Amino acid sequence: MRAYTKFYITPKGERAARSGHPWIYAEEITRTEGEYQNGDLVDVVTNKGKYLGTGFVNDHSKIRVRLISTNTNDKFDADFWERRLRYAIDYRRTVMPGADFKCCRLIFGEADHFPGLTVDRFNDILVAQTLSLGIEVRKELIFNLLYKILREQGEEIRGLYERNDVKIRLLEGMEENKGWFAFAEAAEPGEPLTEIVENGIRYNVDVENGQKTGFFLDQKYNRQAIAKIARGKHVLDCFTHTGAFALNAAAGGAAAVTAVDISAEAVQMTDANASKNGLDKVVKGLKANVFDLLSELVNNKSREYDFIILDPPAFTKSGSTVKNAIRGYKEINLKAMKLLPRGGYLATCSCSHFMKEELFVQMLHDAAADANVQLRQIEARQQSPDHPILWNVPETYYLKFYIFQVV
């Protein structure tokens, strides 16, 4: 006899659960049997009572239950979580070998069956973001197990910094906060600053104040891809953030790189990272609004750049704003295509799950038609494999990345 409260769901919810999707929405629940508290484990069953899975419940969330297992034999003790952590770490050691393992995403939420949990590694600091109550109430166990496993494997980890300063936690009935997590056995972690090496390039990372968890790891191999074709090019890197694409282009032999961001802090960090790597004679930061800058360059009929990189923030974070996002993506891509000479190169991407691949591709077709150019595709890429895409969970696929030659 199982001890968990039962949640009976609709046939629609049953179909989604059987297909492997871990989210049970509030409107899919028909009745419950037993008592529970938010954050508890509950069983999800069909309307006829057939077991579908076990997950975390939270009445504050539209996603009422987040499934973590479909195995009735699982016991959700420390051994269960340790097995799951080791599985995730072993996967990263396979797909992010050598030095890449010191700078990668260790846990990618639902794709690793840790719903609502992200853990990034930046050299000797782990950064975690917890967006589900079920993980929140178990994080002491999970984080200490993760620390133990990494230390056993010879990895030097001085602390875990929590970046829970995101409003989505409020929708889950949790508070916003950030700060060091107190491991059961660890020395004082010190300053929330570290240095990472990605693709042979060194960066300062501020895990306390940087965007999201401090540095965008999902473009690691896309940066390598643009470096291969940057030699001798005059590059315009738009929405540069910490200058990662700009620095990879410079390291690849670019003649000159202009790294643009609207944030003065981002431009300062880009310049500092360029100096750190001896690339400050090639990379120059520029504080500007990318939309305005591209318009100005088009109006001036500039032919200054023969390689343009567009890595904008997510223009849409919900299905209701996709149409506006398409207009924004089209505007910057159209202007970039107009600026590039025949034979020039364009790297462009979208990091929004809601901007579906087919929509992004159609937008690029429309922009190319309006610019009266043809696009020769060099590569179609996605997020790096430490951000794995679980086919049963389309929300885990979000980054679309293309490299074209304009012909």
Locations of the language-model features?
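Non-catalytic accessory regions of SAM-dependent methyltransferases
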Residues: 1-123
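S-adenosyl-L-methionine
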Residues: 265-309
